Design a protein with these regions (language model features):
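N-terminal active-site segment of His-dependent metallophosphoesterases
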Residues: 1-68
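His/Asp/Glu-rich metal-coordinating catalytic cores
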Residues: 48, 59-146
């Protein structure tokens, strides 16, 4: 089984250190990276795609970014799993909660590890940050039931 795993894209990052033109170019490059990730997923015929957090910046995301992500992942002919990180944490006002995702997209919503069986004998475990910073680690008190 082939998985494409990525993280820390930080779409809509403000790039405060850059001038307006450079910041705009950097944000455009981040979108291009997501487009490239989707292209590689198709080209390499991966079985699933996983974003392991910080896909976007919670404080700065726009409706356009929500639509871009929805459309990008809907075009993939494979499952997509999104695990919200500390910069794009899951909550009622998060992009993750507001978007009507296509059936191939699953968002981890709990702050404890949840299993998803990908294939016989292969389980993906994922969780969501539910705030900008979690004090407990996801592995504390975690036991795999065998």
């Amino acid at each position: 089984m082939k998985l494409l795993v990525f993280s820390d894209v930080h779409l809509d990052a403000p790039f405060r250190w850059a001038g307006p033109d450079l910041a705009r170019k950097r944000r455009s490059a981040l979108r291009a990276a997501v487009t490239r990730i989707c292209h590689v997923a198709e080209q390499e015929s991966v079985d699933a795609v996983l974003c392991a957090g910080d896909l976007y910046e919670h404080e700065y995301f726009t409706p356009d970014t929500a639509q871009f992500l929805r459309a990008s992942f809907a075009e993939l002919a494979r499952p997509v799993f999104l695990a919200p990180g500390n910069h794009d944490w899951f909550g009622p006002r998060s992009l993750y909660a507001q978007v009507q995702w296509s059936p191939n997209v699953s968002v981890f919503r709990e702050d404890r590890l949840q299993p998803v069986e990908l294939a016989e004998g292969l389980t993906l475990w994922g969780a969501a940050h539910r705030a900008p910073a979690n004090t407990d680690g996801f592995l504390e008190r975690f036991v795999v039931d065998r």
